[in-house]
Amino acid sequence: MSELNKLPPYMQILFNKIYQNKILTALFDDERIVKLAHFGIKKKIMKDLLRDVAKNAHVLQIGLTFGDEIDCIYQKVKKLGKLDVFDVSALQLEYAKNKYERKNIELANYNAALPWDEKYDVVICYNLLHELPLQTRRQVMDNVLNSLAMGGKAIFVDYAKPVWWQLLRYPLFVFNRLYRPFCESLWQQPLENFSSKKDGFRWQHSYYGGKLWQKTIAVPKILSNEDVKKLTKLFRGK
C-alpha cells in the first residue's frame, strides 16, 4: 500500500468502527439519520452552502460525507462546473463509487494532509476538521488554502462552541470528551487560528442553532494588512 493510500492512525483508532464498516456506513448514510445528527438544521446549512458555490465552479471536497450533501453540490455544478472528492478510506470510496455511479464525480484516494498541485474555485471541508488531530488539521487547512485559484474560496462547515442557553451544549461537551477528542478544540478558538496561513485570508463566520454549527469562509486578501496600513498613511498624508 502506498503512502497516499494508508489510513491515518487516528482514523484506525477512533473511527474504524464506522468508516471501515459496510453495515454502519449504509445505516449512517440514511438522510434521516443525517438530519437527526444535524439537530434539524441541515437544510439551512445546505441552503447557505449552495449559495456560496457558483454553477460553473471547479469544486474540491475534502472527505466523503453521509447523506445527500455531496449530491447537492454535484447538482449545483454538474452542467457548467466539476466536482472532485478526496478521501483516505478505500471502503468509503468504494461505497461512494456505487452511490454516485451515474454521476460525473471524480473520486480520489488521497490524504489531504499532503499538498496537491491542482487549483480550485471552491474547496469544501464539511464536518471534517473536528475529526482531525491538531497537526493534521493545520496541514489540511493550509493545503486547502494553498489550492485556491484566483478569486477562489474555502468553505469549512463544522461544529462551534454553543451559546450558554443551548440545551445541547452540555451533553455535547460530555460526548466530545468521550468519543471526539479533537472536537473540543473548536470550542476554544476561532477556526482560522488552526491554519498557519490565516493572515493571508479574510474570514467570514456564520452560525446555526445557537452556535451548534459554523460555516466559515476564507478568501485570499488582495492586499496584506501591512499594505492596507501603508496605503492608509499615504492617503492621510503621513
Regions found by a protein language model. Give the residues of each.
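Core SAM-dependent methyltransferase catalytic element
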Residues: 199-238
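Conserved alpha-helix/loop element of class I SAM-dependent methyltransferases that forms part
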Residues: 37-56, 68, 72
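Class I SAM-dependent methyltransferase SAM/SAH-binding core
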Residues: 60-113
